[in-house]
Amino acid sequence: MNTFTRAALTVLVGLVIWFLPHTEAIKPEGWHLLAIFTATIVGFILRPWPTGIMALFGIVAAVVTKSITMVQALGGYAEANVWLIVAAVFFSRGIINSGLGKRIAYTLIRSFGTSSLKLAYALACTDLIISPATPSNTARGGGIVFPIVQNISLAFDSEPYGNTARRIGAYLMTTAHTINTITVTIFLTACSGNLLITSLGAKLFGYDISWWEWFQAGVIPGVICMILMPWFIYKIYPPEIKETPEAAVMAQKELDALGPITKAEISVAIIFVLCILLWATAIWTKLHPTVVAMMGVLACVVTGSLTWEDILGERTGWDILIWMGTLVGMAGLLGKLGVVAVFADFVSQHLAGFDWFWASFIISATFVYSQYFFASGTARITALFSAFAAILVAMGAPIPFTILLFGLMNSPGCTLTHYSSGVTPIFFGAGYVPQGTWWRVGLAISVVSFLIHFWGGTFGMWLFGIL
């Protein structure tokens, strides 16, 4: 479809909902905002223009139609969680600039990369180590891990689009992408979608999920998947090359090229560790996670690891500010205007007598496998989280459990297609894995991941007293 067709469909969806009859329990301005919000989501999916532009269209439409005021329209930009992810994206630029991420990766490969399976675990550890401070999994996967995977593959004469792709490149690309989707489960600050979920949850239910609560819910399924997935993929989609002694030599050459560890790397490493400690101990220090992230950014600037020009040029952070501020603001207003509550009550009445825990299993599976219809995790969260979460809460599910459950379910769907998340086209686009194979292997990974995340996450929440 061309731009005009996609834009026309977006507007058409909004107009249809606008003029549909609705219950008197929803005020006209609430219904009109729902129409605009839905059209904005459709715009995110069809993308006649970039996400940030579609978000601005949503704000303008809501204000022009007097569905909300200008102050209300901009209220989402004052949300602390929105600024948390923006600040964390800026901090991740300091990690990339310093070269610390590459040094960690090549050090692990030099030490443990004697086989293709061990190489996969070394790459997994790299992603895990840097994920708490890189909330853009696209930047983490595409900017740090992917180039390393590509270099390793080419070093073993594993070329894309040919007979040599299966030598090692296809396996490493698949595994690195899968791990990138798993680390987002463990740390709240490892993915923008996580903070979108907690922001929407806070707006709808008035409950703020802490960094530590997220870690408690995600660490058990996350660690299980981190250990299991490289081996599982090795079994269902094995590389032709099993032993890789040359990898250590290649890694040493890369480390030699990087030279001795720099002051910038040391300072970023110290700041990185301190930020994680402060996030993890916020329950005692009372420091808001957003303040901690901003402290990390300022520390990077003071130590010279980051400049104001770097911050101004970090397009991902500013883009997130625009679209996430819009979504969080609109979702909060839909809650205040009673739209979400009316919908949740209607659905829960039709599910009366159905146990909320088993309903959460079914709704979680629906949430995960709906990813086939969305071109990003963000679009799926935006479209489904508020409604699905409200239904579960109306059925009796605890609010913290509900919010964290959807956080856990953000991961399994990201392996399903070659367009499931922002980082997916980078690994798929390398040309090592055919589309049909990507979908087939991705489905197998997703099923295992879903079961581990649901049952492991539920056990973790029970173990730590959240459930």
Language-model features, listed with the residues they occupy:
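Juxtamembrane and boundary regions of transmembrane helices in multi-pass small-molecule transporters
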Residues: 1-19, 100, 137-141, 156-259, ...
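Interfacial loop-to-helix junctions that mark the boundaries of transmembrane helices
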Residues: 1-2, 24-32, 44, 71-80, ...
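Hydrophobic alpha-helical transmembrane segments
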Residues: 7-8, 33-34, 38, 52-56, ...
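Generic alpha-helical transmembrane segments of integral inner-membrane proteins
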Residues: 8-16, 38-42, 60, 64, ...
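Membrane-embedded alpha-helical segments and adjacent helix-loop junctions characteristic
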Residues: 22, 52-162, 314, 318-320, ...
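Flexible hinge motifs at transmembrane-helix junctions and intramembrane kinks/re-entrant loops
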Residues: 23-31, 38-56, 73, 226-227, ...
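Structural signature of hydrophobic alpha-helical transmembrane segments
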Residues: 25-35, 79-90, 287-297, 347-359, ...
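Transmembrane alpha-helix interface/packing and boundary motifs in multi-pass membrane proteins
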Residues: 41-50, 126-136, 177-188, 278-284, ...
